[in-house]
Amino acid sequence: MPRPTRGDNLLGPSAKPKVRGSGWAYQPGTLQLGQDHFIPLDSPAWFAWLDQQLAFRFEQVYYVVGRGLAEPVYLNYTVRPEPRQRGQGYWYAYKKYHNQRLSGAYLGPTDHLTLAQLDQRGLQFLAQINPTFYQQLSQFGLVHFRQGPPPEPAPEP
């Protein structure tokens, strides 16, 4: 089945599906179905779902653990396929920064678009946004959680 075109988006230009770092893809209710859909990432249903998407929004919450606090770091960016004249297309990630500068990055073909790949790209975007982020990461450690809130931080010695 061919990928839909931008003109086929019945939900409007701002109704991108959301993919959450919790391991689920969230498809807003459609005009035909009137309900929401959740798809586990890295499953066969995930890769079939990707073949039908024009773009989606990846959202993740990371926690920098240190100084007795688990501080949340929120991230979101747009992912969309870019067609090629020969062969299958490739996916790219795009993040707009506060200064309105757009940064893009290659993610690879559909069969390589996994949660681990999305997480890795997200960490690279975070490093571009806040250069001290990796300093905090190396000093205190980073944890991101698939489900639920972060655990209580360990007491400092």
Regions found by a protein language model. Give the residues of each.
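A positively charged, amphipathic N-terminal helix/segment that binds anionic biomolecules
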Residues: P2-P157
